């Protein structure tokens, strides 16, 4: 009786299964998507009449891939045939361009001339070529110790293994503790500044690996350790001593991300300066006081401050006169700046020459009222701090100038300065 097609299946149901000698190996052993794969059969014995291959856990007709009659070479596809399978004369099964859906258990059933049947089992695991994953973040800018970081490795391959990278290396221990059981979600409560950087995830299987593009995380913090630094001047604790008519630059520094906004105050009054430094171009007694820098972080909504006291140096406290500029030329204005004038001043007077000659009086300032003297040319202006402005200098302004001061206690002091006016050209 000649049997073809599914009739072998009906016969196979009436005979006992014997011996488990058949073994099946896979070539290649770890196939990837698109490979040509062979389920190689070993241990066939006796003269066989037919083979049947099943792609499933049982010998159900619904799992039948194909039946093959040895004597004629006829192959009959079954319900589970995908168009890629072919049975070899030796019983092996070829699968062309294998796909992940071909993964699973395969059963070979053989029939001999005594109509006895044997079965062999094999397993196919097809590893797909992995697409590049993507890291998804709840936010890429977080506030330290306040916000939670949540990253997810998004991949169309649910069976792929996942590993994470931080700045190209392994995750720190604290971050590894926040991984989900499947490794696809990374959570970190109370993010730290040292955890700012580039994060990547990588998916892999035995035949393929793919890493995501980095996602960069910024962690905002501060301001902390706000301090005021200065250039080369004498400092004792929070007090800075400055020579008269010299310049001073104060720098406000802090640890902060992002860079904070700055506000400077002088003796409690806000200054029009939003920079990280403050320049005092020409130090006088009027600039003595407390300077405060306030640093404000617009992301963390935190702020910090530092203060210093700026004073004239001990050497500058003694009364002296300094021309500003020190080498004036014809046509310029010059200010005879008084350093260390008496705090209890009652009256002062400027003379063009010695104070012993009344006709040399330029101006005087008793009780806050400025009065011009006989030697006044209309170009001189006196100030409450004893300084004298001489405008539009000419060469005849060269010579001695004398300042006479009288305190409330009646103490009189006389100070002289020689003014040199350089000609133009």
Swiss-Prot record:
Location within or outside the cell: Secreted
A single Gene Ontology CC term: extracellular space
Disulfide bonds: 153-201, 252-293
Stretch forming the signal peptide: 1-20
Residue ranges of coiled coil: none
GO terms for biological process, alphabetical: sensory perception of sound
Ig-like C2-type domain sequence ranges: 133-218, 223-309
Domain of life per record: Eukaryota
Glycosylation sites: 36, 216, 394
Any matching Pfam family: V-set
InterPro entries attached to this UniProt entry: CEA_cell_adhesion, Ig-like_dom, Ig-like_dom_sf, Ig-like_fold, Ig_sub, Ig_sub2, Ig_V-set
A single MF term (Gene Ontology): identical protein binding
UniProt keywords, alphabetically: Deafness, Disease variant, Disulfide bond, Glycoprotein, Immunoglobulin domain, Non-syndromic deafness, Repeat, Secreted, Signal
PANTHER family for the chain: CARCINOEMBRYONIC ANTIGEN-RELATED CELL ADHESION MOLECULE 1, CARCINOEMBRYONIC ANTIGEN-RELATED CELL ADHESION MOLECULE 19
Medical condition linked: Deafness, autosomal dominant, 4B: A form of non-syndromic sensorineural hearing loss. Sensorineural deafness results from damage to the neural receptors of the inner ear, the nerve pathways to the brain, or the area of the brain that receives sound information. Deafness, autosomal recessive, 113: A form of non-syndromic, sensorineural deafness characterized by postlingual progressive hearing impairment. Sensorineural deafness results from damage to the neural receptors of the inner ear, the nerve pathways to the brain, or the area of the brain that receives sound information.
Family to which this protein belongs: Belongs to the immunoglobulin superfamily. CEA family.
Subunit relationships: Homooligomer; can for homodimers and homotetramers. Interacts with TECTA and TECTB.
Summary of the function given for this chain in its UniProt record: Required for proper hearing, plays a role in maintaining the integrity of the tectorial membrane.
Protein name, entry field: Cell adhesion molecule CEACAM16
Provenance organism: Homo sapiens
């Amino acid at each position: 009786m000649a049997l073809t097609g599914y009739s072998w299946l009906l016969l196979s149901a009436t005979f006992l299964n014997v011996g488990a000698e058949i073994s099946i190996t896979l070539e290649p052993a770890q196939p990837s998507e698109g490979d040509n794969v062979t389920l190689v059969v070993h241990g066939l014995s006796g003269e066989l009449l037919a083979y049947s291959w099943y792609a499933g856990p049982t010998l159900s007709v619904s799992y039948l891939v194909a039946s093959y009659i040895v004597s004629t070479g006829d192959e009959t596809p079954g319900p589970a045939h995908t168009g890629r399978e072919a049975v070899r004369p030796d019983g092996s099964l070829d699968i062309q361009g294998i796909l992940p859906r071909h993964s699973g258990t395969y059963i070979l059933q053989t029939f001999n001339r005594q109509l006895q049947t044997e079965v062999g089992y094999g397993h196919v695991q097809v590893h797909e070529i992995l697409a590049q994953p993507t890291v998804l973040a709840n936010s890429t800018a977080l506030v330290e110790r306040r916000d939670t970081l949540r990253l997810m490795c998004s991949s169309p391959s649910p069976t792929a293994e996942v590993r994470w990278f931080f700045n190209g290396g392994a995750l720190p221990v604290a971050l590894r503790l926040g991984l989900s059981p499947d490794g696809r979600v990374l959570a970190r409560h109370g993010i730290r500044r040292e955890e700012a950087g580039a994060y990547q995830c990588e998916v892999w299987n035995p035949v393929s690996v793919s890493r995501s593009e980095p996602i960069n995380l910024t962690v905002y913090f501060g301001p902390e350790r706000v301090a005021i630094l200065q250039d080369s001047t004498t400092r004792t604790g929070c007090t800075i001593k400055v020579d008269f008519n010299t310049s001073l630059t104060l720098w406000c520094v802090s640890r902060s991300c992002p860079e904070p906004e700055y506000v400077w105050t002088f003796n409690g009054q806000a200054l029009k300066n939003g920079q990280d430094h403050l320049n005092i171009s020409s130090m006088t007694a009027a600039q003595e006081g407390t300077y405060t820098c306030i640093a404000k972080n617009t992301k963390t909504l935190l702020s910090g401050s530092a203060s210093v006291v700026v004073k004239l140096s001990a050497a500058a406290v003694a009364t002296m006169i300094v021309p500003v500029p020190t080498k004036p030329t014809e046509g310029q204005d010059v200010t005879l700046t008084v350093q260390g004038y008496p705090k209890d001043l009652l009256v002062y007077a400027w003379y063009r020459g010695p104070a012993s000659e009344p006709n040399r009086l330029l101006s005087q300032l008793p009780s806050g009222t400025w009065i011009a003297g006989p030697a006044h040319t209309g170009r001189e202006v006196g100030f409450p701090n004893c300084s004298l402005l001489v405008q539009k200098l000419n060469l005849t302004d060269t010579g001695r100038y004398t300042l006479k001061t009288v305190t409330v206690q009646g103490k009189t002091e006389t100070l002289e300065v020689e003014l040199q006016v350089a000609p133009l050209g």
